[in-house]
Amino acid sequence: MARVTVEDCIDKVDNRFDLVLLAAHRARMISSGSPLTIDRDNDKNPVVSLREIADQTISPEDLKEELVHSLQKFVEVDEPEPDTVPLIGSAGASVDADDTEVAMERMTEEELLKGLEGLAPPEEQPEEDE
């Protein structure tokens, strides 16, 4: 990869890291059969992709969009949500008889504190010096 080719591209893509990512993605596209927009001239795919970016036959913004799309694991599709969502425990829902008989035992703060006082504190373990 000639340094001149990179220097020609740096005014099209400001960040060298982004330039390398875009050129590598375009080189992979060329390897997978994407048509060339310039003559090859016995150059390898990375050099051809840099020359395409330098000659502005390929848009860096389009390449970036394709790169992001190729790296996505899940494609988000905005689907409209249904207007009416049934509420949990609504009148139309069936309720088992066993669920209605469950009663919660209530405890006052004083009873809770008395119960906590009855608990034994954890035993202290001697620290080992190394």
From Swiss-Prot:
Catalytic activity: RNA(n) + a ribonucleoside 5'-triphosphate = RNA(n+1) + diphosphate
Keywords, sorted A to Z: DNA-directed RNA polymerase, Nucleotidyltransferase, Transcription, Transferase
Listed GO biological process terms: DNA-templated transcription
A GO CC term assigned to this protein in UniProt: DNA-directed RNA polymerase complex
Annotated coiled-coil segments of the chain: none
Enzyme Commission code: 2.7.7.6
Disordered as annotated region, ranges: 108-130
Molecular function per GO: DNA binding; DNA-directed RNA polymerase activity
Family: Belongs to the RNA polymerase subunit omega family.
Biological function: Promotes RNA polymerase assembly. Latches the N- and C-terminal regions of the beta' subunit thereby facilitating its interaction with the beta and alpha subunits.
Subunit comment: The RNAP catalytic core consists of 2 alpha, 1 beta, 1 beta' and 1 omega subunit. When a sigma factor is associated with the core the holoenzyme is formed, which can initiate transcription.
Protein name: DNA-directed RNA polymerase subunit omega
